[in-house]
A protein has these predicted regions:
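Iron-sulfur-associated redox domains of electron-transfer enzymes in respiratory
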Residues: 1-147
Length: 147
């Protein structure tokens, strides 16, 4: 992974969970783990975000929200599923309204499993996402030049 031309912006959404992974996401943003050393900026606006960080499983009620956030993001974009619930539905997998992991609604690029997912795994997933984002950005630029 080379040097980024801009700081990657991350939007976080809790689909539905026990909030254990959300606490770990907050821990990853704290000075103890210093995720900002990678230039990562947290945003609440999907139009500004490069990385979509999702915790929790997708259910009948929130699947449209997950899709809307994803659709509002500008290309190139990367999705990181954080926690067992986001990866596969987790402990809520057999509930009546749970569809499953995030990949049942949108394409997922990086999986960071764990219950609750550790801040180190979240940071590792985001760093992997940065590499994928760089590749997608190069492919998008090449496609624009070729068009």
């Amino acid at each position: 992974m080379g040097y980024a031309t801009k700081s990657p912006w991350v939007i976080h959404y809790d689909a539905s969970s026990c909030n254990g992974c959300d606490i770990e996401v907050l821990a990853a943003l704290c000075p103890g783990f210093d995720v900002e050393r990678f230039g990562i900026i947290n945003t609440g606006n999907p139009k500004h975000a490069d990385i979509f960080l999702v915790t929790g499983s997708v259910n009948e009620r929130n699947i449209s929200v997950v899709k809307q956030i994803y659709d509002q993001m500008v290309e190139p974009k990367v999705v990181v599923a954080c926690g067992t619930c986001a990866c596969s539905g987790g402990i809520f997998h057999d509930c009546y309204n749970v569809i499953g992991g995030v990949d049942q609604a949108i394409p997922v690029d990086v999986y960071a499993p764990g219950c609750a997912v550790r801040p180190e795994a979240i940071i590792d997933g985001v760093v992997q996402a940065l590499g994928i984002l760089d590749e997608k950005s190069k492919a998008l630029k090449a496609a624009k030049r070729g068009a």
